[in-house]
Amino acid sequence: MKKKTIITILILVLLCVTGGCYFGAKHVWLDGRILPTTVTEVTISGEKLPKIKTLERLDALELLDARKITLNAEQYEQLASALPGCHILWQVPIFGGYHDNIETEVVAASIQQPDITMLRYFPNLEKVDASACTDLAMVTALKAAWPELDVTYRAVLGDTELFQDTTELVFEGEDASELLAVIGYFPQLQKIDASGCGDYAALDQIRKDYPNLTITYNIFLGDQLWPFDTKTLLLKNADGEELQKVLPYFTVLQRVTLTGTVPDQETMYELMHAYPEVVFDWKFTVCGVETASTATELILSDIPMETVDAVEFSLKYFYDLQRVEMCQCGISNEEMDALGKRHPETRFVWSFPFGKGYLRTDETALIPFKYGYPFDNPCTDEQTKLLKYCTDMVVLDLGHMQMKDLSFLQYMPKLKYLILGDTRAADYSPVGYLTELIYLEVFWSDFKESDVLLKLTKLEDLNCAWAKLDRPEALYQMTWLKRLWATSVGIPSSELYKLKEALPNTQVFVHGKHPTDGGWRQAQNYYDMRDLLGMHYMQ
């Protein structure tokens, strides 16, 4: 009996063990519950993550809701690796809090670099609201990492809000440096109206840094507001320090006209050189004469001076001073000439005693007769040597004068009409410098330099009758002449026909008892010359 009982007990124990093993194989103990291994959805909770091996036995599991426990990314990865076919719901630690990984929109009050990586655990995410985040650099990094997401953000500038999709902004703050610091994060911004802001430096920097952005602002100057893109300023009683402070912020300024009281000359000089693209139109005095920086002419004649220092010092205040008249100021010819050479861009005009009057160095037409030099009292080298200063001379009639030195002619590049008839100069070669000559009289003179004539290729009228040409055959080459009077120049009478043959298009006159016979003074160039001299026509 005892043996039979024992066997029965053993059988029962075996059955229990076998049944228990079978049950244990088909069920798991999870979170205080017995769950069949065939379960498809499970929610877990508690302070700790269940053992991974336990969860792995749930081979039919399709959904694991782990949102009631705290997981980190590493733990989630362990779960995902252990349950490859299971959809896991969990609270993702991100943006300083926790968010369901199935959310389509999350709020980011602050963003750290790890947060950007954690976004990969949101398969359904569409939007990130970062409106409360002040770190726009991190917002930009998030956008770059997840371009498919709709990221909203903003910048608060005093009472002004700037959103990511803002295209036009009215900025009324005082400190534009705040705007400068954030504007790069708002690529859709196209236009800024900062008319009420006085932070010119920051606004100007915005303009430079973002050339495709339209920005408007005003600059306060001279009790008036001026748009920064003003081209012309008209200011009365302007302050020099104020000008120096705000002028850098006028971007396309071309002209500043100053009236009333103006800054001192040195301040104006500094401004002129600091802004070479701007014309500063202002008035000042030179030797007691009021003038302007934009003046092209300065008249100082009849003002006694001991030196040219004051005049020369003032030249730097002019933009395009072309002419300065200083007639009878008491300055020597040498000093005036040196002044002009130091400043070739400006024509300096003065006068010197000549005969019964004064001859201006800008004279264009001269006949000594008008200055009291008749034939019986001709001027000499003492007077004519000063003609070298008359560089604008166009007409010069020195016929019958007694000068020997003609070197002054080389300083008359504009000379077109020259009369040296009945003269006895030692050297006529300076005539060769006069390449603009169209009319020349050297009759009854000691002119002998025939080759000089060949340099005068613009010459139209030549009267060399009774001149002492050293090589009269040179005349044969002057085919450009319109008229040639060449009586008794050394060409044999029997060969005069050759001269006419050589110059078929030239009126050649080789006869007569007087150099002007044959109608020499009946030609247009002669009339033009006498008109320029203000003299009557002679026969």
Residues of each region from the PLM?
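N-terminal Sec-pathway targeting helices
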Residues: M1-T18
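Membrane-interface motif at the C-terminal end of an N-terminal transmembrane signal
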Residues: V17-G32
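Concave beta-strand-loop units of leucine-rich repeat
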Residues: T37-K51, D59-E74, L83-M118, P123-A137, ...
